[in-house]
Amino acid sequence: MKPQVVFVLGGPGAGKGTQCARIVEKYGYTHLSAGELLRDERKNPDSQYGELIEKYIKDGKIVPVEITISLLRREMDQTMAANAQKNKFLIDGFPRNQDNLQGWNKTMDGKADVSFVLFFDCNNEICIERCLERGKSSGRSDDNRESLEKRIQTYLQSTKPIIDLYEEMGKVRKIDASKSVDEVFDEVVKIFDKEG
């Protein structure tokens, strides 16, 4: 069976992680966060990519696509090897730019199907406030205002065009993510119930 993938996109603080956790619980998807995989890999002393990832994350830059895709593939392969029924994946925070998308199409063409793109649309100021709140407890080095301004710029320049591209293909399911967690999840449920 081929992996069925839903790409989850939205700016920093749009609530991607929070909503993904709920989707996993309700629909049995496996959640793969590109950012988390990279952060874990960065901490792994045996990783060949660790230092490289560290440098990119510190500078608020997007990590080279080969690294991200190899981590995503590894996770999907391991999940499906352990349980063949588990072939539904939420991939969160990817593809983040044109390069990511081309890399995915080149590497994963025919190997995985993208069902749709779940787009959490959220006003920048709300996103920044949420991240600053999260930064107090998350210990994430990039949850500070300066880093956030950079991450939002990167998102607007790089990721938004990808969403527009999928929009043209009729694959985007857009959600107003500025509402409360429960209200947002109600919208998510409508989409997943319809898409199956």
Swiss-Prot record:
It is found in: Nucleus; Cytoplasm. GO terms for biological process: 'de novo' pyrimidine nucleobase biosynthetic process; CDP biosynthetic process; UDP biosynthetic process. It comes from the Eukaryota. Keywords: Acetylation, ATP-binding, Cytoplasm, Kinase, Nucleotide-binding, Nucleus, Phosphoprotein, Pyrimidine biosynthesis, Transferase. Its EC number is 2.7.4.14, 2.7.4.6. It is an enzyme of class 2 (transferase). ATP binds at G13, A14, G15, K16, G17, T18, R134, K179. Binds 1 Mg(2+) ion per monomer. Its cofactor is Mg(2+). Residues 33-63 are annotated as: NMP. Belongs to the adenylate kinase family. UMP-CMP kinase subfamily. NCBIfam families: UMP_CMP_kin_fam. Catalyzes the phosphorylation of pyrimidine nucleoside monophosphates at the expense of ATP. Plays an important role in de novo pyrimidine nucleotide biosynthesis. Has preference for UMP and CMP as phosphate acceptors. Also displays broad nucleoside diphosphate kinase activity. This is UMP-CMP kinase. It comes from Bos taurus (Bovine).
